[in-house]
Amino acid sequence: MGGFPVGVAGKGMLMLSGGLDSPVAGYLAQKQGIEIECLHFESTPLTSIESSQKVVDLVKSISAYSKENKMALHMVPFKELHMPILDHIPDSYIITIMRRMMYRIATKLALKRNCLCIVNGESVGQVASQTLQSMYTINNVTNFPIIRPLAVYDKVDIVSIAHKIGTYEMSIRPFEDCCTVYLPKNPATAPKLDRAIEYEKTIDYEALVDWCVENTKTIYITPDSDLDLSLLGLEVRQALENLKK
């Protein structure tokens, strides 16, 4: 892989969506010496269990570059928070508020797991939630360091690295995650902070954020893992409970 020994820079929490960008960001972070744990916001049955299986398979790939060929994957049960957002937040701000909630959860989990930063696959201007104004409004909920290895990469470069590390074919499987399954037609590209804060007041989000953190399930993935969630249940929480039996 080259770069620095994994772990020499400390540990980071990778927000892994299942798309092209976040696994590449995880690979590049490891190349810079950051040991990675992954978190995934699963929203079954609003999303299919196959979308979470895709994430398991992506972790298998990037765990090959990890410190001990083993990587923690934290499955966050996001549906309980996802539904109130869809029900109460104006369409144009759904993604903004959803991402703010995700950052809150990621920060709490990162602190719980002794991580020094959050890592994600954001690339400036690539989608509505990744304009500078969006990043400013979303990032406001945390003072935790955010590492964005792909911040100034274009899609061609990202795709090239995904091919190189073997994640491309997995990432393009046609299963939507919680950020894309109910994507509004006209998401705000320059969301205002004061408006986002006002909209959040319609949700009892603090209790729901804590619930998501407390009910997160952790599994450990290696390059040789043969875990197939779809054989264990229709929802991720059910599948992980059955995995213990």
Regions from the PLM with identified roles:
Residues 39-41, 76-79, 120-121, 149, ...:
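Generic beta-strand/beta-sheet core signal
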Residues 124-126, 174-182:
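Small/polar glycine-rich anion-binding or flexible loop at a beta-alpha turn
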Residues 1-15, 23-79, 140, 188-193, ...:
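RNA-binding accessory domains that recognize and position tRNA/RNA substrates
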Residues 60-68, 108-116, 163-167, 186-187:
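Generic secondary-structure signature for well-ordered alpha-helical cores
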Residues 166-174:
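A short alpha-helix-loop-beta-strand transition element characteristic
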